[in-house]
Structure formats: structure tokens, C-alpha cells
Amino acid sequence: MKLMTMPSEFQKALPILTKIKEAGYEAYFVGGSVRDVLLGRPIHDVDIATSSYPEETKAIFNRTVDVGIEHGTVLVLENGGEYEITTFRTEDVYVDYRRPSQVSFVRSLEEDLKRRDFTVNALALDENGQVIDKFRGLIDLKQKRLRAVGKAEERFEEDALRIMRGFRFAASLDFDIEATTFEAMRSHSPLLEKISVERSFTEFDKLLMAPHWRKGISAMIACQAYDYLPGLKQQEAGLNHLIVSLKDNFTFSDHHQAWAYVMISLAIEDPKSFLKAWKTSNDFQRYVTKLIALYRIRQERSFEKLDIYQYGKKMASLVEDLRKAQSLSVDMDHINTLDQALVIHDKHDIVLNGSHLIKDFGMKPGPQLGLMLEKVELAIVEGRLDNDFTTIEAFVREELAT
């Protein structure tokens, strides 16, 4: 198969391939970018594979950076762009089902492609637009099928994260997993416990943000892979609820909303501990935990002005999106009205602060000062007090007198 027109991302990188070939080596576009252009999808990263060894690659170009030279990768800075160029390689026995004990550089494109995970990711493209397909990836691409390169069992024993990648590709590409590949994923799912939580989180996160995320979750359920992921053991019922409880065309607006609804579906009682088990950042934990709290408030009643002040309009909108996807009542106009009615959106918007209370009223730093500031803040939010210096002073004077 030959591309009639090279996409602009590849055209810009063609001089790189030309230089390498002029130096006497082979060079091809490889991986996800080739797959995506054949599917008519946007291209993100342009990866280049070559028969030149790293030191040979560095000798061809003036500006290079060793970003992963032990694995054969050199970053080339050329024509205003950055390109990762990786030497054809084979990989020895894998350690702990996640990393090769040794990487060997080779001159053969086919040897390089056979170590890749799925046939649709094992395609290469030359400078003339000719697709090199050694493992029937084009047929799988046409039939929207995800199939492991070579023996599926070996691919997943080499790197068990490929199981999670399989779920993610099913979700992002809307592909079905080929039967033999699926069975190997199912039988090797226990190996996911060997994978770093951070790597599993990245794949699960991408799955949740994919347009066909239900397909990825369904495959995970069918493989019983969830039993080997943090906080998901024996959570088949919760994961099924996650799939069926939202409208078919619903996709998550952002990562916070996605993980919040996962925990809502699983009825997780301690969201922070759940997210800690996934080794997420403290900021992520705080935001998602607040989002779940606001969701539960909304399940009980309509939003009030104080809710919008404390949680924010954006977070309230994420909650309403989830309610709409469940065919529950929503009222974005009410949220907008409450937000517009807020005199302040943050305590720093208040014209008077703790320093003023210390200076003008002789208050001392401590709990009493903090409590007074909270009273001022609440009174302004609820509309009982104007955000005016003189008015606030009078309010404080009255509070201190009682």
C-alpha cells in the first residue's frame, strides 16, 4: 500500500529520513503515527526508526541530545523541530515482566517491528509513502482488529503493561481484540501486579478519556484484569454500573470527572485512599475528592450560593454533566445565576484582611482572628454584608461587642 499524499507532519520530517539514507542507512516512520494517518486520525508524535546505531546517527546531524541512548534513542534538533530517532533493536529476556534485561541494536527493520505489541503498531512508512507491513497489520487495521505481533503469550510475558495498552487501544480506536490475543491477555492478567502503579494509571487514565471507553472497560471486565489493579479487586458489579449508568454517547470532560465517577460507581467510601493507592498527586486527590463531595451534595438538593463559592462554577458544571448523562435533573441556568450573584469568588477578594483586624481592632493572630474572618466571608457570600471597608468594620465591631 502506498500513500498518495504525505501528511504535513511527515513532510516536515522527510529531510531527516533523506539525510540518514544519504549517509547509507535505512530510515522509516514507525508506530502510532503511521497507524493514525492510515486511520485518518490526528498525528501526535512522529517517531523514526533507523538502521544507524546511535553514534552513527549523532555523526549525521549537527544538533542531537542523548534522551535514551542506552535504548538506542537520539533526539535530533533539525528544521525547527525535534525528532526522536531510534535504532532498530531486539530485546532480550524481560525482567519482572516489564523491562528487557538487554537491548541489542540490529540492522533489520523486520527484527525491530517483531518486538512491538500489536500488528497495527508494527507498520512502517518509507520516504515515498510506501507502507511496510510485515505482520498483516493493514488487514487488522481494515477489520478494526487488535492482534498481538507473533505469539501473543510472549508479548504479554515480555511486558504485562501491554495488556492495559490493549484495553486502551480498544477504547481509543474502537477496535475489537482478536480471540487469541484476548485469551492471552486474560490468562496473563495476574502479571499486572508486577507493573508499576504509575504505568498502569497512565494507561487506565487514557482509556477513561478515550471516546469508546466503555469498550476498554468491558474488555477489562471480561479479562478479569480489574482484580489485579489497585482498589478494583472484586469490583465487577461497580465497573458494570460504570458502563451502563451513563448515556451511550457520553465522554468524560476531564480526568477529574472520569476518576470521580469511577469511584462513585464503585461506591468507594474513602476516595483519597483509593487515589493514593494509584499514586496520584496530592492536588489530583484533593480536586477529585471535592468533586465527589459536591456530587453527593447535589444528589440531596439543588446547589446554593455557598456551594458555588466553595467549590466553583466549573466543578458544579462537571457534576451537572454527570447528572445529565444519567438522565437526572440539571439546571445550569441556576448555577450561572448563583455564580453571577456572588460578590466575591475568593476570600482574597474581600477588601479587609487579617492585618486590618490586628491593626484597627487590636486582635491577635490565632483562632479568634480566623473565626472572625470566616464570619465576614460567609456574611458577604450570603449577601448579608457588602464588600465595603466601612461596612465590614461596623460588622466586626458589632460582632466583637456581642
From Swiss-Prot:
It catalyses: a tRNA precursor + 2 CTP + ATP = a tRNA with a 3' CCA end + 3 diphosphate; a tRNA with a 3' CCA end + 2 CTP + ATP = a tRNA with a 3' CCACCA end + 3 diphosphate. CTP binds at G32, R35, R116, D159, R162, R165, R168. Its EC number is 2.7.7.72. Its cofactor is Mg(2+). Mg(2+) binds at D45, D47. One of its GO terms (biological process) is tRNA 3'-terminal CCA addition. Keywords: ATP-binding, Magnesium, Metal-binding, Nucleotide-binding, Nucleotidyltransferase, RNA repair, RNA-binding, Transferase, tRNA processing. InterPro entries: Bact_CCA-adding_enz_type3_sf, CCA-adding_enz_C, CCA-adding_enz_firmicutes, NT_sf, PolA_pol_head_dom, PolyA_RNA-bd. The keyword Iron-sulfur does not apply. Pfam families: PolyA_pol, PolyA_pol_RNAbd, tRNA_NucTran2_2. GO terms for molecular function: ATP binding; CCA tRNA nucleotidyltransferase activity; magnesium ion binding; tRNA binding. The keyword Nucleotidyltransferase applies. ATP binds at G32, R35, R116, D159, R162, R165, R168. Catalyzes the addition and repair of the essential 3'-terminal CCA sequence in tRNAs without using a nucleic acid template. Adds these three nucleotides in the order of C, C, and A to the tRNA nucleotide-73, using CTP and ATP as substrates and producing inorganic pyrophosphate. tRNA 3'-terminal CCA addition is required both for tRNA processing and repair. Also involved in tRNA surveillance by mediating tandem CCA addition to generate a CCACCA at the 3' terminus of unstable tRNAs. While stable tRNAs receive only 3'-terminal CCA, unstable tRNAs are marked with CCACCA and rapidly degraded. A single active site specifically recognizes both ATP and CTP and is responsible for their addition. Belongs to the tRNA nucleotidyltransferase/poly(A) polymerase family. Bacterial CCA-adding enzyme type 3 subfamily. Homodimer. NCBIfam families: PRK13299.1 (NF009814). HAMAP family: CCA_bact_type3 (MF_01263). This is CCA-adding enzyme.
